[in-house]
């Protein structure tokens, strides 16, 4: 069984994971529809306008903590010999809440009002948005931790 935490220690792999995380996020944002989709797209447009490359840098900065939070779920998935997509989707709320512990803590320490405002706009639906991303997220985890 592969460990996400161990995989990220490889300096050749880490940038690939970061790039794939950014692609996954872009795809999820592009898929959003309706009023909430407009809000999500607007929030991310604001974030990207504040500092180009911020999303990639943020993923790189958070990746070790994200891996630590997700790795127990991945290990359970592997122990159960479960289909990663099925496992991650069925555990999406627990995984989302584990990941949000990281970002909630970070946003409390942020000095950037625009980022705080954008996060506050998205946070009420964050568990749902992360849950929507679980199939792609499971594919990403499988790609690197298998």
Place the predicted regions along the sequence by residue:
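Hydrophobic membrane-targeting and insertion signals
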Residues: 1-93, 97, 102, 120, ...
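Amphipathic alpha-helical binding modules
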Residues: 98-145
């Amino acid at each position: 069984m592969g460990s996400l935490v161990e995989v990220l220690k490889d300096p050749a792999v880490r940038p690939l994971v970061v790039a794939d995380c950014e692609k996954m996020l872009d795809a999820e944002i592009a898929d959003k529809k309706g009023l909430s989709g407009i809000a999500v797209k607007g929030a991310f447009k604001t974030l990207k306008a504040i500092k180009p490359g911020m999303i990639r840098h943020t993923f790189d900065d958070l990746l070790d903590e994200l891996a630590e939070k997700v790795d127990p779920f991945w290990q359970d998935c592997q122990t159960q010999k479960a289909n990663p997509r099925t496992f991650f989707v069925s555990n999406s709320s627990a995984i989302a809440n584990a990941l949000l512990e990281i970002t909630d803590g970070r946003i409390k320490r942020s000095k950037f009002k625009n980022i705080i405002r954008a996060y506050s706009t998205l946070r009420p639906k964050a568990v749902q948005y992360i849950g929507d991303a679980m199939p792609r997220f499971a594919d990403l985890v499988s790609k690197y931790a298998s």
